[in-house]
A protein has these predicted regions:
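C-terminal lobe/lid and adjacent interdomain/linker elements of RecA-like ASCE P-loop ATPase modules
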Residues: 1-4, 235, 243-245, 303-388
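Pre-Walker A-like glycine/lysine-rich segment at the N-terminus of P-loop NTPase domains
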Residues: 1-65
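Short beta-strand segments that buttress and anchor functional surface loops
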Residues: 7, 97-102, 243-245
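Glycine-centered tight beta-turn/hairpin loop motif at sheet-sheet or coil-to-beta transitions
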Residues: 12, 103-107, 129
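Conserved P-loop NTP-binding catalytic core
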Residues: 36-47, 51, 60-119
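Conserved ABC ATPase signature
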Residues: 45-49, 234-279, 283, 287-300
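Conserved catalytic network of the ASCE P-loop NTPase/AAA+ motor domain
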Residues: 91-92, 103-105, 279-282, 311-317, ...
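Electropositive, glycine-dotted interaction segments
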Residues: 109-235
């Protein structure tokens, strides 16, 4: 489970910005809360609102870049190869990422600073017995270790300046860093691109009857009129996806007809693309990161997807969700807690993205926060009109 994410100097984000799943003292919807241990209570869902170009998607992009550098293509760098550095406004200072998370009952803090050429700083801490303990740290090429020192010194000497030590240690199956690496690999998932998302749904349908049945159940609950889905040419790059629909005639007889997925509505295609990854995240207890959750979906379908994560009867493994949205219908204190709603706003003077929670405004219980948001009380909306 993710506790918090911090990013500094990435795209439109200049200064350190923190988004936190730690629950406040708000007592509303206590049944939503995740409790990984006796002391910690975490939120299952966070929503980020903001005007176009305010930078809310850049928060999620920073999370995705961090994962890419740990377990993705950017982790496979060779010596001298450039890193995916996208600083604010062309500044020359390093970018920093940090994740605080819980994996297998242990809290970890992992972060690093980098530019296009090298890793300047990297560190990993854990709390195995409730106390902070260093696993490794690295700053300007100088490493510090607490266990298996000789082995890790040898490994650090083989780690080029532009490669994360967490990646190198995983390459060499170092047990001290295995769990942190596994969290990025297994528990951090993204629905940022339609094609990979669709691939996940297709993979689940062809993997077995149980997963296909679960997907069909959700498609039917969504009232899309789909009774079956078939996949052909799964060995090729582009599978042929066919949906089956049922018609009940006036005389009571039943007929079936089929459509190619590309003949379905855009909303149906988007829901189909999402649902496989959604169910997989719930099954794995993963964090799901989604940009523009409402894209082409009916508001009730969007709400259904969120409810699946909020409802502990469905979300039995402690999955979490963070998403960006413009859907003001979700701004409802009868649906979300105050600490679940966040805003991204671009500073008028610096053009840098700033993040803050609705909880910082202390709205009253039952207050119409949707109306307050659209009236500009909480910021993070476009300024329309005025002098050109």
């Amino acid at each position: 489970m993710l506790i918090q994410f911090t990013v500094e100097n990435h795209r439109s984000i200049k200064n350190s910005a923190v988004i936190s799943f730690a629950a406040s003292k708000d007592k509303s919807f206590d049944e939503y809360l995740l409790r990984p241990d006796e002391k910690k209570t975490l939120l299952p869902v966070l929503a980020i609102y903001g005007a176009n170009a305010a930078g809310k998607s850049n928060v999620l992009h920073a999370m995705m870049t961090m994962k890419e550098m740990v377990v993705g293509n950017a982790a496979k760098v060779s010596k001298g190869q450039k890193l995916p550095w996208e600083p604010f406004g062309g500044t020359k200072v390093p970018t920093s990422f940090e994740m605080v998370f819980i994996f297998q009952g242990v809290r970890y803090t992992y972060g690093f600073s980098f530019d296009a050429k090298k890793i300047y700083k990297e560190y990993l801490y854990h709390w195995p017995n409730g106390r902070e303990a260093l696993i490794f740290s690295r700053e300007n090429g100088v490493y510090e270790f607490r266990e298996n020192v000789n082995e890790q010194v040898t490994l650090s000497n083989r780690t080029p300046d532009n490669k994360l030590y967490l990646v190198s240690s995983n390459d060499w199956n170092l047990p001290q860093t295995e769990n942190a690496y596994r969290w990025f690999m297994e528990k951090l998932t993204f629905l940022m691109d339609e094609e990979p998302a669709t691939s996940e749904t297709v993979a689940q349908i062809v993997s077995g009857d149980d997963k296909k049945a679960r997907i069909l159940k959700e498609l039917m609950l969504a009232d899309l009129g789909i009774t079956d889905v078939t996949i052909k040419n799964t060995s090729g790059k582009i599978p042929v996806i066919t949906t089956t629909h049922r018609i009940i005639n006036e005389d009571g007889t039943t007929e079936y007809f089929q459509l190619l997925m590309e003949q379905e509505s855009v909303g149906t295609q988007h829901f189909f693309a999402c649902i496989g990854g959604w169910l997989q995240a719930l099954e794995n207890g993963a964090l799901l990161v989604v940009d523009e959750i409402e894209d082409s979906l009916h508001p009730l379908l969007t709400r259904r997807l969120i409810e699946m994560v909020q409802d502990k009867a469905v979300n039995t493994k402690g999955a979490q969700l963070i998403f960006t949205t413009h859907d003001a219908m979700l701004l409802d204190l009868n649906f979300f807690r105050r600490d679940q709603i966040w805003f991204a706003e671009k500073n008028d003077e610096t053009c840098a993205t700033e993040l803050y929670s609705l909880a910082s405004f202390s709205p009253r219980k039952g207050e119409n926060v949707r109306k307050g948001y659209l009236q500009g009380r909480f910021g993070a909306i476009p300024f329309i009109g005025g002098d050109a």
